[in-house]
Amino acid sequence: MSQRITIDHRSAPALRHPEKAHRPDNPIQRKPSWIRVKAPNHPVYHETRALMRDAGLVTVCEEAACPNIGECWSQRHATMMIMGEICTRACAFCNVTTGLPKHLDEDEPRRVGEAVAKLGLKHVVITSVDRDDLEDGGAMHFARVIHAIRETSPQTTIEILTPDFLRKDGALEVVVAARPDVFNHNIETIPRLYPTIRPGARYYQSVRLLDGVKKLDPSIFTKSGLMLGLGEERMEVAQVMDDFRIADVDFLTLGQYLQPSAKHAAVEKFVTPDEFDGYAAAARSKGFLQVSASPLTRSSYHADSDFAKLQAARNSRLKESL
């Protein structure tokens, strides 16, 4: 007769990544000099942090342990993460907590709109955790956040960084109908590495998502990015670039993968700044409107100034076609 064992989870410390607990440790390598950043200590950084706390908002800057948080928050640039801080996926590279999310906060769109107005942002980036537990993957919540920002800050341009809405019929149409200025969905890595790095996702689903945005509304800028240093080969990155161009992706970002903990995927290589320059040159030759490639490049890094460059590049290309 089997014995039933009851575990009292209330007395156990919460694990940020319980699904990774059984994995062998991957030693964290010392970062090269070109990746190190200063600890945040600017007064505006603390003001931005306090505003996020007071509004009860989550930022991907903190949850994903972004190395650029000091620089960005010192300029009042914070990427807000909606729909909670718990993700239903368990990607091998990501520092966001995995688990069973809470119910959606129906008041969150209003608070995001107010925070954007208080920060006086000209350009805002909104991202989210994956919400596979929701029927629409959180698409309507994204739309409500976009509408709330339009109400409080009609001149602010809006960039969204979305999940893949895998098996969520109609979700993409809902988000695109809300008309963000930039629709970003990150591929993250090359298709060969998906089974180990991004096991809950499908590479071609992500490519189709980006292609679908352009088919629904060609005026919306599309954007996607990869982390380098996970074991990819140069030709594999070039193939992803080609897939992006077939899907008419406008903006490509390339940055160095940094290992959040010993339980996460190991850094296979620190890609040098010169190598990033080479990737950027290759991407520009393929026709992207905008390319950002450097060790510290992240999806929303310098997003405001990059959006201005993106608009200028489109206008220039339109003039050339006349």
Swiss-Prot record:
Give the binding site residues for [4Fe-4S] cluster 2: 87, 91, 94
| GO MF terms held by the record | 4 iron, 4 sulfur cluster binding; lipoate synthase activity; metal ion binding
The cofactors named for this UniProt entry are: [4Fe-4S] cluster
Q: Composition bias, kind Basic and acidic residues: at what positions?
A: 1-25
Pathway, per record? Protein modification; protein lipoylation via endogenous pathway; protein N(6)-(lipoyl)lysine from octanoyl-[acyl-carrier-protein]: step 2/2
Q: Name one GO cellular component term.
A: cytoplasm
Q: Where are the transmembrane segments?
A: none
The record's listing under PROSITE patterns reads: RADICAL_SAM
Q: Which residues form the Radical SAM core domain?
A: 73-289
What species is this protein from?
Gluconobacter oxydans (strain 621H)
The record's cofactor note says: Binds 2 [4Fe-4S] clusters per subunit. One cluster is coordinated with 3 cysteines and an exchangeable S-adenosyl-L-methionine.
Q: Does the keyword Nucleotide-binding apply?
A: no
Keyword terms = 4Fe-4S, Cytoplasm, Iron, Iron-sulfur, Metal-binding, S-adenosyl-L-methionine, Transferase
* Amino acids binding [4Fe-4S] cluster 1: 61, 66, 72, 300
Q: What is its EC number?
A: 2.8.1.8
Q: Where in the cell is it found?
A: Cytoplasm
Residues of the region (Disordered) are 1-29
- The protein depicted here goes by the name Lipoyl synthase
Q: Which family does it belong to?
A: Belongs to the radical SAM superfamily. Lipoyl synthase family.
